[in-house]
Amino acid sequence: MKIYDKKLAYPYFVWMVLFTVVPLFIVVYYALTDSTGSFTLDNLVTVSGYGSVFARSLLLAIISTVVCLIIAFPVGYFLSRLRVNKQHMMLMLVMLPMWMNFLLRTYAWMGLLSLNGPVNAVLGVFGLGPYNMLNTSGAVVLGMVYNYVPYMILPLYTSMTKIDQSIVEAAQDLGASTTKTLFRVLIPMSIPGISTGITMVFVPAVSTFVISRMLGGGSNLLIGDLIEMQFLGNSYNLNVGSAMSLVLMVIVLLCMSFTSSFDEDEMEGVS
């Protein structure tokens, strides 16, 4: 039976090798070689000149992740306290926008935020605006939050459904205020969901290029835009693009490692 179970893992192993390990080695190879295939570190030196773009990408990704967490935490708690049949209905509403094409959702925000769009029309009723909200960092963050907040809600909801409500009630019976219950009970016990949600939001946010191009215009280039330009744009250069991808991968892994270590420390404190 154990041998049979191991055989079931073979297709997954082959899939991981072909579509994860092999592409990773290809990226590393191109990042550390020039057009002739000779070893060089010039590509990494070139990437160092785009430090401001990396910093902007990290900043906007962190902001969008924090905003998603602030929105998703109360939503996840609210969903976890509903009856099971209502939970299913509300989860369907949360997931419904994810069924729509990513580009269409972003295009919709272009229309909403345009000078003649509904948002400026509502502001005009109050004698405000019109404001040029497109091609700004705020529009990029808004697009990230809208597209990725479901990925924060779902893991938080899953973690919170596992919290024994009697523990929360016991804390309140012992005189803990709502704020103290939140920070001493709910948040520590939701750390697994918070950690997963941060990873699921931060990784696509820091590497996005569609949202930054459509809502940020050319004035808010992110690292994803530069990588896309190196592989598909006029600046075609596989070696530099691979070096950028490699550096971004290292940054993401470091951030995930930090989140994972924080997760473990918090869980030890709870236990």
Model regions and ranges:
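Transmembrane alpha-helices
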Residues: 11-20, 66, 96, 146, ...
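Transmembrane alpha-helix signature in integral membrane proteins
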Residues: 49-81, 178
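C-terminal transmembrane helix and the adjacent membrane-cytosol boundary/short C-terminal tail
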Residues: 2-12, 22, 26-27, 157-168, ...
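Membrane-interfacial helix termini and adjacent extracytoplasmic/periplasmic loops
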Residues: 41, 106-145, 179, 215-219
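Interhelical loop and adjacent transmembrane-helix boundary motif
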Residues: 41-49, 53, 209, 213-267
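Membrane-embedded alpha-helices of multi-pass transport/permease systems
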Residues: 21-29, 70-75, 103-107, 116, ...
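Cytoplasmic-entry segments and transmembrane alpha-helices of multi-pass inner-membrane transporters
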Residues: 8-9, 75-112, 168-169, 182, ...
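Short membrane-interfacial helix/loop motifs at transmembrane-helix boundaries
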Residues: 6, 14-51, 112-116, 218, ...
